[in-house]
């Protein structure tokens, strides 16, 4: 029975200094028909409210209010293909017999993506289940997963002019920051720094997932990734003010109005920078020849030495033949650290706060002490900048391509750009027929290829997806290209 049911059993406890209540809660869908279930509990007033709600819905004059995109400046017209109007399932069936992408289908997928983001916009980010699957008891607890899924889902909010989606994303972040600060303190003993978990329910974000194969407590790059859409929001709209009526947020921060730059971006960037400032330890370093070293009591690095970023985790992979995913010098970490430091120095040069010249000098010194990217015999960027690790390309994630997307480090570095392109080629070849059914992996590759200005590869990836079984008739997508997971992604 519910805890608010006055007829339910009550336990009275007297003269206790403290009480510990251990409960176990589970879901069930084995409740039978509603009428049978109601008869078993008909003496409980709890169901009066349910009956009232059902009767109100039956009597209500319900009108459908379509979600309005309201983006007159956003349009995609490809031309060609079939003439006439087709239902979604008709287009999907037609696509099965066409070698090339049907333009009408691609247009509709684009607008459907805009619709999905607009429908989710305003108060939070989209979660794994979205609004689109029809049930909530899904895989991965229908969570907000922040090592690829949320990131890919919000990747187009700024370039598409979805202002409300950007604001909702920031509310999503602001709810979590206190827990992020606590995570950094509990895992690493850091002060005024942030460390994010892989999953959140959208309200709390404590670090609760620890595993030798998925050691997300050592996923260092997450906060930098989550920061980038806010950075892009400022680039898109300039200085802006957002307002919330969320009581919990107002209570948490003591206000309902936030300056995006001063109240959201700059404080989070400073905490993210503080993380990278504190993780380096001179006792763990690589020498002039790139060999990993440990020297107890070492207090500073020599000119040709670099920090080891240790521990490190490259979601969700581990080196070939290595027993653990807890590693060092993940390329994702190196890239995220460089990106955050560059954003931080850019912020300092913009705000020119007292002592900013010294702070810029310290940040640039830290940048020089970070490890460099390493390259394998094929010329691909290595997922771990360590001589001791072998590449493991039979994997769905491409976290090591962070320099291309979401960062912009390949834009003016042709060697790094070529290395990222080769890394995708290696992944596609060595992971074929293994765990290459994860749709987020293919979309991630398409985003990287777009940044690398490789139009043919972007087209090939999209063509693979439209010929897979990824799409529901709503045109929303499954986690897997064979629709084996039943969860919107």
Question: Which role does the model predict for each range below?
Answer:
Residues 128-143, 191-264, 277-362, 403:
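The feature captures the catalytic groove of carbohydrate-active enzymes
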């Amino acid at each position: 029975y519910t805890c608010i049911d006055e007829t339910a059993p009550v336990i009275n406890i007297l003269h206790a200094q403290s009480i510990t209540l251990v409960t176990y809660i589970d879901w069930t869908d084995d409740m039978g028909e509603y009428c049978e279930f109601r008869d078993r509990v008909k003496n409980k007033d709890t169901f009066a409210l349910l009956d009232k709600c059902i009767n109100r819905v039956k009597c209500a004059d319900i009108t459908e209010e379509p979600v309005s995109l309201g983006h007159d400046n956003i349009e995609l017209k490809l031309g060609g293909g079939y003439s006439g109007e087709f239902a979604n399932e008709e287009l999907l069936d037609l696509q099965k017999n066409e070698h090339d992408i049907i333009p009408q289908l691609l247009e509709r997928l684009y607008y459907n993506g805009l619709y999905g983001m607009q429908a989710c916009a305003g108060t939070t980010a989209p979660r794994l289940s979205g609004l689109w699957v029809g049930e909530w008891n899904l895989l991965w607890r229908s969570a907000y997963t922040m090592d690829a899924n949320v990131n890919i889902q919000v990747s187009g909010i700024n370039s598409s002019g979805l202002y409300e989606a950007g604001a909702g994303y920031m509310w999503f972040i602001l709810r979590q920051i206190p827990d992020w600060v606590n995570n950094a303190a509990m895992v690493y003993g850091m002060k005024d720094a942030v460390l994010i978990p892989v999953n959140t329910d959208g309200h709390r974000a404590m670090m609760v997932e620890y595993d030798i194969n998925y050691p997300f407590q050592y996923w260092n790059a997450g906060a930098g990734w989550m920061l980038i859409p806010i950075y892009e929001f400022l680039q898109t709209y300039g200085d802006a003010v957002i307002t919330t009526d969320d009581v919990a947020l107002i209570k948490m921060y003591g206000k309902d109005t936030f300056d995006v730059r001063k109240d959201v971006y700059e404080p989070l960037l400073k905490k993210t920078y503080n993380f990278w400032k504190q993780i380096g330890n001179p006792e763990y370093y690589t020498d002039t020849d790139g060999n990993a070293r440990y020297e107890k009591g070492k207090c500073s690095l020599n000119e040709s030495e670099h920090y080891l970023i240790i521990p490190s985790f490259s979601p969700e992979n581990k080196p070939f033949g290595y027993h653990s995913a807890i590693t060092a010098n993940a390329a994702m970490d190196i890239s995220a650290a460089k990106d955050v430091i560059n954003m931080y120095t850019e912020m300092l040069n913009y705000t020119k706060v007292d002592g900013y010249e010294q702070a810029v000098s310290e940040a640039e010194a830290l940048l020089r002490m970070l490890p460099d990217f390493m390259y394998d015999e094929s010329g691909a960027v290595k997922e771990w900048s360590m001589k001791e690790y072998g590449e493991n390309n039979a994997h769905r994630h491409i976290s090591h391509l962070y320099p291309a997307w979401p960062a912009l480090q390949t834009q003016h570095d042709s060697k790094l750009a070529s290395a990222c392109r080769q890394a995708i080629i290696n992944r596609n070849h060595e992971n074929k027929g293994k765990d290459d059914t994860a749709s987020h992996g293919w979309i991630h590759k398409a985003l990287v290829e777009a940044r690398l200005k490789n139009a043919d590869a972007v087209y090939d990836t999209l063509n693979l997806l439209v010929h897979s079984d990824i799409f529901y008739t709503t045109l929303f997508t499954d986690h897997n290209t064979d629709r084996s997971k039943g969860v919107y992604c």
